[in-house]
Amino acid sequence: MKYGRSTATTEENHLRNCKNDAMIALYLKLRAAAFVDFENVSTAATADYVSWRIEGGRQFANFYIQKKKIRILTLEPTKKYDLGENVPDTHLWTLNYQTDIYSENDIEEAKNIIHDSYDKLN
């Protein structure tokens, strides 16, 4: 019996099913800017989000591609950023920092937040 719609898929299939081409393009620009700096990182996806994981399965960033924004969940960064906020403790999520990006103007800061999350696991 299957519950929910969060079945495993690939990043490519997830992007193919997204409805907003502008947000897909924004995700791909962010990916090109940030992903190249990482070692031993892979992607996984569900119907709801794309996950970046360090080898061994430890997630450091989840990307929810929505109609008007991309919501990114990461580990809480070590420094203060203008983008993002802590997720309430009641959620009990490991990735406890939420960042919303709307345009290319947000990519550099989002990249720094993602790198901070990655560095916490290395």
Which role fits each region the language model picked out?
Residues 1-20:
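A short, surface-exposed helix-loop junction/capping segment
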Residues 2-5, 36-47:
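Short N-terminal helix-initiation segments at or just after the protein's N-terminus
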Residues 17, 21, 101-104:
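Charge-dense, low-complexity intrinsically disordered segments
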Residues 20-40:
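Amphipathic alpha-helical segments
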Residues 30, 41, 63, 70-72, ...:
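Hydrophobic beta-strand residues in large extracellular and virion-surface proteins
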Residues 44-98:
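Short, conserved beta-strand/beta-arch hydrophobic-aromatic motifs that form part
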Residues 91-122:
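Well-ordered alpha/beta subsegment
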